[in-house]
Amino acid sequence: MGIRIEKAVPSDAAKLLEYLKQVGGETDNLTFGPEGMPFSVEAEAEFISSMENSIDNIMLLAKCDDKIVGCASLKRLPRRMKHRGDFAISVAKDYWNKGIGSQLLDNIIAFARENDFEVIDLQVRSDNKSAIHLYEKHGFEKIGEHPAFFKISDENIKFEYMYLLLK
């Protein structure tokens, strides 16, 4: 199984939207479910295009052959928070525990360092122990929690706030 990590390009838009529907249906750890993201292929391609040559944002895809099996992004925050980037990641369930999350995160951290980010922020479900372990392995620290970050079927879901100080 050869996994490639690549920057997303506009021609990935349709496959990325399908991937997001897939992973949204595999876990309750994401901000969306099996409906995926509410964007057209054209809108997604435009969004990817806006990130393509940016030093403020990046979207990476993990691919096995031509299939998207993971996605990670880092978006620089505005104005007085511009030293920080907000991080998001997902990996298809069939590819969990194969090092893909680590590969994506390594590449995101390298991009952040190269482009003068000082802090990477993320939020993670408190019961997502695998993800928390991945982040801690890469140097992230817990800095707080939110007792009702998600609400799924009338149940409040607790999240941890974590950050990685780069400078």
Regions found by a protein language model. Give the residues of each.
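Conserved catalytic-core motifs of GNAT/GCN5-like acyltransferases
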Residues: 121-124, 136, 141-157
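A short beta-loop-alpha structural element at the N-terminal edge
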Residues: 4-18
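Terminal substrate-recognition subdomain of acyl/acetyltransferases
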Residues: 156-167
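Conserved acetyl-CoA-binding loop-helix of GNAT-fold acetyltransferases
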Residues: 97-110, 114, 133-137
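Short glycine/proline-centered loop/turn elements that form peptide/ligand docking sites
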Residues: 105, 128-131, 148-153
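Active-site acidic-Proline motif in GNAT/NAT acetyltransferases
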Residues: 89-94, 98, 126-127
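Conserved GNAT acetyl-CoA-binding A-motif
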Residues: 112-123
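Acetyl-CoA-dependent GNAT
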Residues: 10, 24, 34-93, 105-106, ...
